[in-house]
């Protein structure tokens, strides 16, 4: 694949995902959120009782679809393999910092772009911070910083997260064990089927 074809496919993926996000917002997702990885993980964590903020508790099918979409397409294209990174504690801490930073600015980079397209000035402030963060990371890499190489692990390991999200989907649709907000952003959501399909599309393109 040459660079031109790659850019065209990325542009097509961006257009499709943008349309999916707009459709999810029109079908009930928060208008200034549509599809946000950080926010949806927060909502799903709340649904499982991992935090007590009652306005952001809902098992988001988009997150489930995202994981399953990537998993299914990787198997279909024979690209599936399970890898594990080195320096797990550092990776964990960096992940926590990224999530806190995303939620402070009310969303992940995906939602940031969606909000920028709607003219939200706060998103533009976040964009400046995002650029500075990327520049800092590039500088660190050029200075030799590395977390070490990822290594291939047993394929069963890669199926653990898809199995977990399937279990969450079953609990969300077949039981009342998970929490669901009655007000606030957590109460605003598209129909489950539409959300799940949207997540599958995002996951497939991400893979």
Regions found by a protein language model. Give the residues of each.
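Membrane-interfacial helix-loop segments of redox and metal-homeostasis proteins
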Residues: 1-207
């Amino acid at each position: 694949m040459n660079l031109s074809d790659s850019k065209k496919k990325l542009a097509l993926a961006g257009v499709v995902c943008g349309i999916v996000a707009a459709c999810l917002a029109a079908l009930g997702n928060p208008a200034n959120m549509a599809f946000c990885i950080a926010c949806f993980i927060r909502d799903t964590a709340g649904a499982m009782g991992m935090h007590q903020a009652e306005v952001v508790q809902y098992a988001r099918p988009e997150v489930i679809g995202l994981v399953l979409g990537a998993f299914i397409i990787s198997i279909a294209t024979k690209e599936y393999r399970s890898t594990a990174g080195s320096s797990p504690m550092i990776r964990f801490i960096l992940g926590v910092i990224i999530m806190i930073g995303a939620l402070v600015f009310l969303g992940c980079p995906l939602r940031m772009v969606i909000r920028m397209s709607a003219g939200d000035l706060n998103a533009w402030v976040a964009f400046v911070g995002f650029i500075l963060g990327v520049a800092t990371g590039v500088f660190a890499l050029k200075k030799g910083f590395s977390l070490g190489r990822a290594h291939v692990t047993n394929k069963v390991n890669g199926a653990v997260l898809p199995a977990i999200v399937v279990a969450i989907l079953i609990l969300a649709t077949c039981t009342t064990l998970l929490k669901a907000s009655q007000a606030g952003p957590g109460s605003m959501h598209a129909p489950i089927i539409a959300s799940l399909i949207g997540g599958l599309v995002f996951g497939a393109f991400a893979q």
